[in-house]
């Protein structure tokens, strides 16, 4: 990014701190800020992943999606359910940043007080409020995985599949051990 002339600003320890600072910079300098997940147009674009999955595997039973703020999961779950309501969408979060699980259990957008995960791409304290109704309607289940499971999944993907996947993307791989998918067609979205 710097090579294109942009000034890179690293701020805070979790997404929520960086996002608040980005809004301040946008206001101060007149920048345009496009939220990376709490934006229905961004989430709609991410829904194209569901189209690709269903095109390649029309009989898919489960789609596992990593969750930070919920944009990717909103897009994938909403479009998947629109195209085939029988598809089960499983959201997967780090145990140390389970803001969607907390919010779904509370029935409203909830902020978790502490983040503790190696999955920094999903280290979000609060899911997107614009997205939450779609997540409530379209996510069938939430699984949380801990950092040790992510580490084992990283090693498995590297050693057995020759793929290097960052920790947020590995959430769905680690989650495979949590449910019995025998005889089912399952897609794990590797994205963070």
Model-derived segments and spans:
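PLP-dependent amino-acid enzyme catalytic core
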Residues: 1-191
């Amino acid at each position: 990014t710097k090579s294109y002339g942009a000034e890179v600003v690293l701020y805070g320890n979790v997404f929520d701190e960086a996002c608040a600072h980005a809004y301040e910079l946008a206001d101060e300098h007149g920048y345009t800020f496009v939220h990376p997940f709490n934006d229905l147009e961004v989430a709609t674009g991410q829904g194209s992943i569901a189209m690709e999955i269903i095109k390649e595997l029309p009989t898919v039973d489960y789609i596992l999606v990593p969750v930070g703020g919920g944009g990717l999961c909103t897009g994938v779950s909403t479009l998947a359910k629109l195209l085939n309501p029988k598809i089960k969408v499983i959201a997967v979060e780090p145990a140390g940043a389970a803001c969607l699980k907390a919010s779904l259990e509370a029935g409203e957008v909830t902020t978790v007080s502490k983040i503790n995960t190696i999955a920094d791409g999903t280290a979000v304290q609060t899911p997107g409020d614009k997205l939450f109704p779609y997540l409530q309607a379209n996510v069938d289940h939430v699984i949380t995985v801990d950092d040790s499971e992510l580490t084992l999944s990283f090693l498995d993907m590297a050693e057995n599949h020759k793929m290097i996947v960052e920790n947020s993307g590995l959430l769905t791989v680690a989650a495979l051990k949590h449910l019995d998918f025998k005889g089912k067609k399952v897609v794990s979205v590797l994205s963070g």
